[in-house]
């Protein structure tokens, strides 16, 4: 039986896109898409090898944003709009890392979902 050949990654020539930063209390996920929502690159603190409570640090979010920006720039990305979702500690540092990586940030939008008194929240932690 013939060995299945892996598809070669096609270089998409896209100038502008959207960086979605999903910052939870436990992890930070950075996904860079084109304006239609098709994924170009993604990275997360966990995917970079951070484990446990180190995933939720601002430094881990910074590294995730740098990794996603680097692979998105290989597709020709130059400008990016940022949408931030979630209450995590990596929100600010991920945005700064995208700008420092050479992407021009044109807009920052907070799209954190706010319930209109929907489901009951989890009980308070007693440490």
UniProtKB/Swiss-Prot annotation:
Name listed for the protein in its UniProt record: Small ribosomal subunit protein uS11
Task of the protein: Located on the platform of the 30S subunit, it bridges several disparate RNA helices of the 16S rRNA. Forms part of the Shine-Dalgarno cleft in the 70S ribosome.
Database matches in InterPro entries: Ribosomal_uS11 (IPR001971), Ribosomal_uS11_bac-type (IPR019981), Ribosomal_uS11_CS (IPR018102), Ribosomal_uS11_sf (IPR036967)
Keywords per UniProt: Ribonucleoprotein, Ribosomal protein, RNA-binding, rRNA-binding
Keyword rRNA-binding annotated: yes
Matches recorded under HAMAP family: Ribosomal_uS11
Family statement: Belongs to the universal ribosomal protein uS11 family.
Biological process (GO), any one: translation
Keyword RNA-binding included in the entry's annotation: yes
Gene coding for it: rpsK
GO cellular component: ribonucleoprotein complex; ribosome
Record note on quaternary structure: Part of the 30S ribosomal subunit. Interacts with proteins S7 and S18. Binds to IF-3.
Record organism: Streptococcus pyogenes serotype M1
GO molecular function term, any single one: structural constituent of ribosome
PROSITE patterns membership: RIBOSOMAL_S11
A Pfam family assignment: Ribosomal_S11
């Amino acid at each position: 039986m013939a060995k299945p050949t892996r598809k070669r990654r096609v270089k998409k020539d896209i100038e502008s896109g959207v960086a979605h930063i999903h910052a939870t209390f436990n992890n930070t996920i950075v996904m860079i898409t084109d304006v239609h929502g098709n994924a170009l690159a993604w990275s997360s603190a966990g995917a970079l090898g951070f484990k446990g409570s180190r995933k939720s640090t601002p430094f881990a979010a910074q590294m995730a944003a740098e990794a996603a920006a680097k692979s998105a720039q290989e597709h020709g990305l130059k400008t990016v709009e940022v949408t931030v979702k979630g209450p995590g500690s990596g929100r600010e540092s991920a945005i700064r890392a995208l700008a420092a990586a050479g992407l021009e940030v044109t807009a920052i939008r907070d799209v954190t979902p706010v319930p209109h008194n929907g489901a009951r929240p989890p009980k308070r932690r007693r440490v």
